[in-house]
Amino acid sequence: MWRLRLLVLAVLAAGSAEAQANSSDGFLEFSVGKFTYFVLSKSSPQEAVLRHISSNVTFLLFQIHSQYQNTTVSFTKTLLPSTSGTGNDRGLVFILRPEQAVCTWYLETGDTKPVQSVALTLSYSERDPIPGGCNLEFDLDIDPNLYLDYNFFETTIKFAPANIGYARATEPPPCDVSTSRESRWRLRYDVYQYFLPEGDLTEASLLHHLQRMAQVAQVKASAIKVATLTADDKTAVSFSSLPGQGVIYNVIVWDPSLNTSAAYVPVHTYACSFESVDGNCASPGRVSTKVFSTLFALLGLFVCFFGHRFWKTDLFFVGFIFLGFFFYILITRLTPLQYDVRLALTAVAGSFGGLLLVASWWRFGILTLCMLCVGLVLGFLVSSGTFFTPLGNLNVFHDDGVFWVTFSCIALLVPVIFMGCLRILNILACGVVGSYSVVLAVNSYMFTSLSYITLNVLRRALNTDFRGAFIRVPFQTNDYIILAVWGMLAVSGITLQIRRERGQPPFPPHPYKLWKQERERRVTNILDPSHHIPPLRERLYGRVARIKELFQKEQPAGERTPLLL
């Protein structure tokens, strides 16, 4: 029994040694299909060697990954643009010569800090397509890499077209001589997306999940296919950016004639910087955003439970959203102001919009106009939620005209449906929109996918290129919890207000008419004590006189004792 235990321990030790790799004297030895963890430093570059390559292998794909520090992989010790690649996720394709059984790569980093890395070597036969084999855009002759670029709005990946496979010691098939079924134009490209756990920014987690996105079978089993491209399509795909959320992308090139596939080098992003001071990956929300969203959520929470009873507060909330949304879009598209300045101006404009809607109700009392604004705000949220579903990724909605017309029709449909029961419309808007403001506030402190229900619409209004982006977000444990909280707040607020308003007038009376009637009553009714109240000017003069008396010295009153006792 003890011999069996020793044997098991020896096997485990051997496996661990293979996984970590022997890096003594700057030398790493790899095995095909096995991930190797190692630490790369500026002072000690590494030499990676793969031995005992099978004779039926035509080309090798070597790749190295790190979290955010750059690494370099090269065919030669002297770095050249055509024989090396530098980045977080980089790889090289090596076309084997006849009888070649050993292959060598050189690894290094220019970062002053040690870089925890993971590397992998994959082998392919002559029937497999070659990722990046028809590269005409990037530096490498054969470039299997995905080039990723992101901003606040979208994340874009680009890659070089592949070529069909060929045997050792033969010339590669021409890339652009013909478009027949015997050329690379028959190839198809499947784009995959994989989400890391929400809120997990650890290096170990990333390197672990990258193993699920490197080989064809694992990519198909773990990730979600977002799009399929043909050789006629542009080799670039855009996605909505998710700051603070880790995402891994990869492309599988498929040869339908031979039914063979090969994977490009996976690439990852968090759509944020690990090294910036404000708005970094650990805390993606700015301080100004946190203050704004927190105050907005407090107002929304009050409206959620008491909006219909405090009708003017409800109107202020709706007017704030209505004018603030359009004002932010306007100043963002027309001015180069900084984000914090734009947010402050939006708060001022939103407050003005809220006061304007309250003033219009006080003076004119047009209930239909006020409820149209309330219904449009609720309709905006309903329409945004509709396009948050897979419906929003349909190709027809990549056209701005079709999208905005459909979006507006859905938003207008809500007030039209509820025009016969305005009180129910207002209570629904208070409960749903007011509780959603809490979701937006949560997003400034921790990532939640639910905030992108409205943020994606805002991005589309701000950036014309966003129309072509695929809108996909993770839905994990945090999102289920926040969705439950949102639903609980909305249902509680709606139920409470419906029960409280039972038997009450649907809406308060026109304030200006009440004020006018009260003024006429005081003028005509001399028995009313308020009739004898002095005019406002006299009351102000009287108060000023009383205040002045407080600062005057007491005057002497003459003799204070009687002369005669």
UniProtKB/Swiss-Prot annotation:
Pfam families hit by this protein: TM7S3_TM198
Transmembrane domains' residue ranges: 287-307, 315-335, 341-361, 364-384, 402-422, 427-447, 478-498
GO biological process: cellular response to unfolded protein; negative regulation of programmed cell death; positive regulation of insulin secretion
Membrane topology: Multi-pass membrane protein
One Gene Ontology cellular component annotation held by this UniProt entry: plasma membrane
UniProt subcellular location: Cell membrane
Keyword Glycoprotein: yes
Signal peptide: 1-21
Alphabetic keyword roster: Cell membrane, Glycoprotein, Membrane, Signal, Stress response, Transmembrane, Transmembrane helix
Keyword Glycosyltransferase: no
Glycosylation site residues: 22, 56, 70, 259
PANTHER family: TRANSMEMBRANE 7 SUPERFAMILY MEMBER 3
General function of this protein: Involved in the inhibition of cytokine-induced death of pancreatic beta cells. Involved in the promotion of insulin secretion from pancreatic beta cells. Is a downstream transcriptional target of p53/TP53, and acts as a pro-survival homeostatic factor that attenuates the development of cellular stress. Maintains protein homeostasis and promotes cell survival through attenuation of endoplasmic reticulum (ER) stress and the subsequent induction of unfolded protein response (UPR).
Name under which the protein is recorded: Transmembrane 7 superfamily member 3
Organism: Mus musculus
Gene: Tm7sf3
